[in-house]
Amino acid sequence: METMYHRFLCIPFLLILGLAQGQSKGLQTVTTFRTGLKPIDVTAIRTGLQPIATFHTGQKPIDVTAIRTGLQPIATFHTGLQPVDVTAIRTGLQPIATFQTGVQRVSTFHGEPASTLQGSGSTVIKKIMVSSMNQPVSKNEGIVEVPPPSGGTHVITEEMNWHGGRNGHKMKKLGKKKHHKNRHGGKNHHKMKKIGKHHGGGRKFGKKHRHHK
């Protein structure tokens, strides 16, 4: 019995070791989350068409299927009686998912080693954030809170506050660049003051300006 128990404890380490070998070949990543007494397995096959993730929360399974060849994989989380939908556009570089479980945080993205959490009793998943480097997650921003299922797992899903536009800044439609009242940069981009002899004189820095003869 003790031998079987030790073998069971070695399974997560074998998964991590297999991940390290799989990353060198670019084949697959395996992440295992343990919630209470039930395992939560996430398996993503890099070379195939679709990675499949299965989350066991309480008594209900949560299945995530993403087709890599398309533009947007859709993940549906069924928690309690309400579904929580997460849509991520895969045209960016790295979609990032952050799982905060209790006090520890588990972050998974393409290229990161797999991790294993073991918890006693019920595990509380605080946040699930999915974002992309180049594309927004969804047009709707906010927090969706659902009632915990019978297993005692509470899930709060929060989407990233995406700032689109050039250089990641949120930009408004204010016409051309040089007409932006707060923009700084380059010739004719600054808000020029009418000072100097070409603009009929005037004051500059509190001193009277005189024309040169």
From Swiss-Prot:
Keywords of this entry: Repeat, Secreted, Signal
Sequence repeat positions: 27-48, 49-70, 71-92, 93-104
One GO CC annotation: extracellular region
Subcellular location, record wording: Secreted
Keyword Secreted: yes
Span list, region Disordered: 162-213
Keyword Glycosyltransferase: no
Region of interest: 4 X 22 AA approximate tandem repeats: 27-104
Leader sequence residues: 1-26
Feature: compositional bias, Basic residues: 166-213
Name of the protein this chain belongs to: Skin granule protein
Origin species: Xenopus laevis (African clawed frog)
Primary gene name: sgp
